[in-house]
Regions:
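All-alpha prenyltransferase/terpene-synthase fold signal
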Residues: 1-168
Length: 168
């Protein structure tokens, strides 16, 4: 699980959050300390975003998010959802569907239901909250140190709120 979370954090965080936040800091002439805080915030937001993306792929409404509803299962993508499921007694019923290129909607729904029953969905929803809380703590620290203007803090909080509640 630790490896999956680390990979998820760096995969999405770097190009979607860390680099854009650092670029914004450079463009407005922020200090290196501000850049460093923004990088930490970006890593946390990126992890939350990726975990939320994984949840949407398996449990989300495809009409809402526009993705293939079972692509992660079909591709055998090792996510936090799967890592948790592997540790449960439900794994045998899930594994037979995992990584099957020919996964049909009925079997995909059965795997999704088992993932929900074994607690994977709840577990990963809890994981989403942790990096959002860490991002908020890092943001408060940066604000307290006078490294970020209030408008930047407000924008980052709005972004974090969208990350945590996204449905697509």
């Amino acid at each position: 699980l630790r490896t999956i979370l680390s990979t998820s954090a760096y995969k999405t965080s770097t190009y979607s959050f860390v680099l854009p936040l650092r670029a914004a800091a450079v463009l407005v002439g922020s200090s290196t300390a501000a850049e460093d805080h923004l990088a930490v915030i970006g890593r946390h937001l990126g992890l939350a975003y990726q975990l939320q993306d994984d949840l949407l792929s398996v449990f989300g409404d495809p009409d809402e998010h526009g993705k293939d509803p079972f692509s992660d299962l079909r591709e055998g993508k090792e996510t936090a959802i799967i890592a948790y499921a592997r540790m449960t007694s439900q794994w045998d019923g899930i594994e037979r569907h995992f990584g099957r290129a020919d996964l049909n909607p009925t079997d995909g729904a059965a795997a999704r239901d088992r993932l929900r029953e074994c607690g994977s969905e709840s577990f990963v929803r809890g994981l989403v909250r942790e990096p959002l809380e860490s991002a908020d703590a890092a943001l408060r620290e940066a604000e307290a140190a006078g490294l970020l203007p209030a408008a930047a803090g407000d924008a980052i909080r709005a972004l974090a709120s969208r990350v945590g509640s996204r449905s697509r």
